[in-house]
Amino acid sequence: SLGRTLEILAEVIKDRKQEKTEGSYTAYLFTKGKDKILKKVGEECAEVIIAAKNSSLEEIRYEAADLFYHLLVLFEEMGLNLTEIAEELNARRK
């Protein structure tokens, strides 16, 4: 499921942040800091929009995956976890 996949990816991201894995793009983002991470989130948002404008499902899938990944990096940088996001979404359904 998407939820489990995101949980696993979030754990990998957390590990890369803590271990500062050499050659890791994730570790690089954390080294560069919040501004770099925010820039990447913005870029990926724009790329999802462009993919949708192009009506390309393949492009949307690819860019959405990039956006999910960069959002997870941002969440880790900010100390936010997926459970908190899920709780917010669930609260909105009421």
Please report, for each region that a protein language model flagged, where it lies by residue.
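Flexible "arm" and connector segments at domain edges
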Residues: 1-64, 68-94
